From Swiss-Prot:
Belongs to the ADRM1 family. It comes from Schizosaccharomyces pombe (strain 972 / ATCC 24843) (Fission yeast). This is Proteasomal ubiquitin receptor ADRM1 homolog rpn1301. The lineage of its organism: Eukaryota, Fungi, Dikarya, Ascomycota, Taphrinomycotina. Keywords: Cytoplasm, Nucleus, Proteasome. It comes from the Eukaryota. InterPro entries: DEUBAD_dom, Rpn13/ADRM1, Rpn13/ADRM1_Pru, Rpn13/ADRM1_Pru_sf, RPN13_DEUBAD, RPN13_DEUBAD_sf. GO terms for molecular function: endopeptidase activator activity; proteasome binding. GO terms for cellular component: cytosol; nucleus; proteasome regulatory particle, lid subcomplex. The keyword DNA damage does not apply. The keyword Disulfide bond does not apply.
Length: 291
């Protein structure tokens, strides 16, 4: 479900300096909710909307979208992580600055109050509503690229089957958010992946069958059988050891070794176990419906 879309470009750091330079490439900032209820903050080139350069899953209150007050020559904004020195920078490409503040406020409201979003409401323009001829008028000394073609992509909403299976995943990720607080702390996988948090997910159709190849040979092929495994001391010890390995120095290398992508915008002090869970969330979201 598309939540908000508006024209914006990237601000890129000049190598070897702390200076930011506006990239003249025309783009969109898009926020949407995927089939699993995850909120994505994206930036994509206008002629390549299907492959966003930035695709960040944002959790409740972990970041803010703010105006760069130090910039006096243009309309610069940043996606800021209060617990980290890392931020992503953008510049507004709408012809008028009338809605700049409103866009920022809406982005922050979506980040902060994710559970209050009503999937049935969508009073925000989608990408396809914004395909008018661009007449960007900027006060910044930025070269304006030529529009080579008219875009025609749309961001679709999840179908009913995806919605029905998404709530369990959303609840599990909400538990991650509550446990960690996203303040640079670590999480304990034993607390996050305990049976009471997994039951709803395990009840989803097909989940048990997909887990069976990884269960001990004599495990009954039903919910009770899998719950017995995830309730066992051996499971807890394995999770504890894995959690310690992820949270150790260099533990994030385990994530890459497992074929999962790291989030470049993550707080550098964020524990490896939390980054591992976020990486799984991104993987599931991006591969939804691919099988």
């Amino acid at each position: 479900m598309s939540l908000i879309t508006f024209k914006a470009g990237k601000l890129r750091r000049v190598p070897g300096t702390k200076l930011l330079r506006a990239d003249p490439e025309k783009g969109y900032i898009v926020m949407n909710r995927d089939a699993y209820g995850l909120i994505h903050f994206q930036w994509a080139k206008r002629n390549d909307l299907e492959n966003p350069e930035d695709d960040i899953i944002v959790f409740s209150s972990e970041c803010t979208f703010e105006k760069v007050t130090e910039c006096t020559t243009g309309r610069a904004y940043m996606l800021k992580y209060p617990s980290s020195a890392h931020s992503l920078f953008y510049w507004m490409q709408e012809a008028s600055d009338d809605n700049d503040t409103s866009y920022a406020e809406r982005i922050n409201s979506y980040i902060k109050d994710q559970d209050l979003l009503d999937p049935a409401r969508s009073d925000v323009a989608t990408v396809s509503d914004m395909m008018e001829v661009d007449t960007v008028e900027q006060s910044e000394p930025i070269a304006q690229p030529t529009e080579s073609s008219k875009e025609s992509s749309e961001i679709g909403a999840p179908n009913s089957d995806e919605i029905n299976s998404s709530e369990a995943v959303r609840n599990l990720l909400a538990t991650i958010s509550a446990q960690a607080g996203f303040g640079g702390s670590t999480v304990d996988l034993c607390e996050i992946l305990k049976p009471s948090n997994l039951t709803d997910l395990l009840c989803q159709e097909g989940v048990i069958d997909r887990l069976m190849p990884y269960m001990p040979p004599d495990t009954p092929n039903n919910l009770e059988g899998v719950l017995a495994i995830v309730s066992s001391p051996q499971y807890a010890q394995a999770l504890r050891s894995f959690s310690q390995a992820l949270n150790s120095p260099g533990g994030v290398n385990i994530i890459s070794a497992l074929g999962l992508s790291l989030d470049e915008s993550a707080n550098p002090n964020e524990g490896g176990a939390l980054q591992f869970l976020k990486a799984i969330a991104r993987f599931v979201s991006r591969n939804n419906g691919s099988e």
